[in-house]
Amino acid sequence: MKKLRCILLIDDDEPTNFWNHFLLTKQNCAEHVVIAKSGREALDYHRHCMEAPVQSELYHWPDLIFLDINMPRMNGWEFLEKYISLPWEGHRKALVVFLTTSLFPEDLAMAEAMPEVAGLENKPLTPATLENIWKLHFPEYP
């Protein structure tokens, strides 16, 4: 699988972030894997990306976002609503995949109804999950 430039993990759970970061690094999925521990931190990161020079060493525009649904203060749905409303002139939106332990049918139905959401996967990431995401959404990256 070919590397993406940047993957953003948005999750408040440190063990999950540790595992997902480890797996993405081990599988050589991206040049940069960035962790945001809250929706607010992720929005701040995107604002910095928009303000940073194109070749910034600190902020890398994500190609893929793995987003937790259940987080305190700002859940994944609230983050996504604010993310979609950011000023996108000259910038491309990242592919968003929810990573969750939620078994609520409402979450699956909402994810399927939103064109901004590319999928909903169970936590934690696995090599098979990554392979499926690459086959579906990044076929140019064999």
Segments predicted by a language model, with ranges:
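Acidic di-acidic motifs
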Residues: 10-13, 38, 68
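Helix N-cap/capping motif at the beta->alpha junctions
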Residues: 35-49, 76
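Active-site beta3 strand of CheY-like receiver
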Residues: 50, 54-66
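Alpha4 helix (beta4-alpha4-beta5 surface) of REC/receiver domains from two-component response regulators
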Residues: 21-22, 78, 90-97, 103-120, ...
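Receiver (REC) domain active-site loop signature in two-component systems and cognate sites
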Residues: 71
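Conserved phosphotransfer cores of two-component systems
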Residues: 57-60, 84-92
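Conserved acidic segment of CheY-like receiver
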Residues: 5-15, 20-24
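C-terminal output helix
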Residues: 124-137
